[in-house]
C-alpha cells in the first residue's frame, strides 16, 4: 500500500547570512588559511607555516580552548592571537543523556548577529561496546521535506561553516574528556566514528562539509580514519562523485523506497534525481569495493515499503553495487503519518535481503527517549510544544 503524502515543491529557500563574530574562531581553517590569518595579524612570513602547525596541533590534537594553554607559543604571540582571534566552538546549551547512554547536545552557534537570532543545531553521541559514533549536523534545518523525517518539518535556515561542523566533533571530545593529555597520552578513543547524518543534507553544503571532514580525518590532527567517517545523502547526484574524489569517506544513501513514485513522496529530491541516476552514481562512486561498501539506509514503514516484493525489488536495484543495507525501524514523532513496521515483518524483510547476499542489519533505535534517534532531530530554533514533546516521549516509552 502506498500512502498519498502531500509534499512541498522543491524550491530554493532564501538562506540567512552567516555573520562571523567580531573575533573569529580559528576552528575550521585549513593550514594554508591559518597561515593567511596569521599574516593578517602581523606574523612574519618566515614564521607563518611553523606557527600554523603549532596552532593546528594545539587545536586538533590537544583540544586547547584558550591560547593561554599553548605553552610552546611565546607570550607575545599568545597575546596577539587573543586580541584578534579565538578557538571557540559551539556553545552547549543543553545536554540530555538517554537511558541507553546516548547523549544529545543542543549547540548554539557563535554569531556576530543579535544573540536573539543565534541559531542552534543538535549532535548525538552513541556509545557502543566496540565504538563510539558521533552524529553531526551540516545545516540548520533542512530543505528536503522528507515526509517521514522530523528534521524535514523544520525550514532550512542556513548552512553551517566548516568550523561549526568541526566544532561539533570538538565539543563531543570536550564533554567526553577525549583529548590527549598527560593522563591519556593516546586519548580515550571514545569518539571513534563520525557520521554526517544529523540535521541537513551534507551535499547541499558540500564545500564546508568537505573542508571540515578533511580536518577531522587529518592524521596530524583529530585523526579519525576516513573508513570510520560516513557521509549520508538523500541523493544529490552531482556531488556524489565529488565526495569520493575530494573527501574519500564512506558513502551512505538514504534510499527508503524501490519505486520512483513512492520515493517521490518519501524523499521529494527523487523528482530531481530519480533512482536510475542515483544508483548509477553509486556504481561509479570512486573507491567503492567489497572492502568499502556503500550503505543503503531503508526506514521500515508499516504497509508502505516493507513488503517482500519491496525486498525483491531492492535486491534487483542494487545488483552490481558493493552494498550493505541498514534497515531502520521508523522512529515516531508527533504528527507523523507513518507507523513502524511490525517486528516480524522487519525480520522477514531482513532475512530475504540477507539470503540474497547482502548484509542487512536492523539498526537498534538509540536515544528515542531524548528525541535523538534517526529522523527525530529538530533544533530548538523551532521548538516543539509541550504537548508534542509529551506525546513523543510517550511513544518512545511504549514502543
From Swiss-Prot:
Catalytic activity: adenosine(2503) in 23S rRNA + 2 reduced [2Fe-2S]-[ferredoxin] + 2 S-adenosyl-L-methionine = 2-methyladenosine(2503) in 23S rRNA + 5'-deoxyadenosine + L-methionine + 2 oxidized [2Fe-2S]-[ferredoxin] + S-adenosyl-L-homocysteine; adenosine(37) in tRNA + 2 reduced [2Fe-2S]-[ferredoxin] + 2 S-adenosyl-L-methionine = 2-methyladenosine(37) in tRNA + 5'-deoxyadenosine + L-methionine + 2 oxidized [2Fe-2S]-[ferredoxin] + S-adenosyl-L-homocysteine
Coiled coil spans: none
Source taxon at top rank: Bacteria
EC number: 2.1.1.192
Any one of the GO CC terms: cytoplasm
GO MF term list: 4 iron, 4 sulfur cluster binding; metal ion binding; rRNA (adenine(2503)-C2-)-methyltransferase activity; rRNA binding; tRNA (adenine(37)-C2)-methyltransferase activity; tRNA binding
Transmembrane segments: none
GO biological process, one term: rRNA base methylation
Cofactor(s) the record lists: [4Fe-4S] cluster
Main location: cytoplasm
Residues at which [4Fe-4S] cluster binds: 142, 146, 149
SMART domains associated with the record: Elp3
Domain Radical SAM core: 128-371
Major enzyme class: transferase
Family label: Belongs to the radical SAM superfamily. RlmN family.
Misc. comment: Reaction proceeds by a ping-pong mechanism involving intermediate methylation of a conserved cysteine residue.
NCBIfam families, alphabetized: rRNA_mod_RlmN
Protein name: Dual-specificity RNA methyltransferase RlmN
Organism of provenance: Rhodopseudomonas palustris (strain HaA2)
Amino acid at each position: 500500500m502506498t500512502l498519498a503524502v502531500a509534499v512541498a515543491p522543491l524550491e530554493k529557500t532564501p538562506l540567512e547570512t552567516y555573520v562571523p563574530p567580531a573575533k573569529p574562531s580559528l576552528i575550521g581553517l585549513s593550514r594554508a588559511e591559518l597561515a593567511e590569518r596569521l599574516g593578517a595579524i602581523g606574523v612574519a612570513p618566515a614564521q607563518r607555516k611553523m606557527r600554523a602547525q603549532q596552532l593546528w596541533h594545539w587545536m586538533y590534537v590537544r583540544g586547547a580552548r584558550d591560547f593561554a594553554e599553548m605553552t610552546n607559543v611565546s607570550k607575545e604571540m599568545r597575546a596577539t592571537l587573543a586580541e584578534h582571534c579565538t578557538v571557540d566552538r559551539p556553545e552547549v546549551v543543553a545536554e540530555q543523556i538517554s537511558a541507553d547512554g546516548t547523549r544529545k547536545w543542543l549547540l548554539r552557534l557563535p554569531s556576530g548577529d543579535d544573540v536573539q537570532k543565534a541559531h542552534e543545531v543538535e549532535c548525538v553521541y552513541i556509545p557502543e561496546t566496540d565504538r563510539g559514533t558521533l552524529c553531526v549536523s551540516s545545516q540548520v534545518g533542512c530543505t528536503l521535506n522528507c515526509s517521514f523525517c522530523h528534521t524535514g518539518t523544520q525550514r532550512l535556515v542556513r548552512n553551517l561553516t566548516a568550523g561549526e561542523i568541526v566544532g561539533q566533533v570538538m565539543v563531543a571530545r570536550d564533554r567526553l574528556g577525549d583529548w590527549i593529555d598527560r593522563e591519556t597520552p593516546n586519548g580515550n578513543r571514545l569518539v571513534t566514528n563520525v557520521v554526517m547524518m544529523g540535521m541537513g543534507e551534507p551535499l547541499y553544503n558540500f564545500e564546508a562539509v568537505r573542508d571540515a571532514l578533511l580536518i577531522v580525518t587529518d592524521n596530524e590532527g583529530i585523526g579519525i580514519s576516513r573508513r570510520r567517517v560516513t557521509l549520508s545523502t538523500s541523493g544529490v547526484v552531482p556531488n556524489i562523485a565529488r565526495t569520493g574524489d575530494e573527501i574519500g569517506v564512506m558513502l551512505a544513501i538514504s534510499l527508503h523506497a524501490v519505486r520512483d513514485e513512492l520515493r517521490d513522496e518519501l524523499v521529494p529530491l527523487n523528482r530531481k534525481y530519480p533512482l536510475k541516476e542515483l544508483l548509477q552514481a553509486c556504481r561509479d562512486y570512486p573507491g567503492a569495493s567489497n572492502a568499502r561498501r556503500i550503505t543503503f539506509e531503508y526506514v521500515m514503514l508499516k504497509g508502505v515499503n516493507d513488503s517482500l516484493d519491496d525486498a525483491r525489488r531492492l535486491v534487483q536495484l542494487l545488483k552490481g553495487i558493493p552494498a550493505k543495507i541498514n534497515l531502520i525501524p521508523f522512529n515516531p514523532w508527533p504528527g507523523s503519518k507513518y507507523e513502524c513496521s511490525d517486528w516480524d515483518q522487519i525480520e522477514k524483510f531482513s532475512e530475504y535481503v540477507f539470503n540474497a547476499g547482502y548484509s542487512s542489519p536492523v539498526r537498534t533505535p538509540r536515544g528515542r527517549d531524548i528525541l535523538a534517534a534517526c529522523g527525530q532531530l529538530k533544533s530548538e530554533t523551532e521548538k516543539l510544544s509541550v504537548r508534542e514533546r509529551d506525546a513523543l516521549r510517550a511513544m518512545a516509552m511504549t514502543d
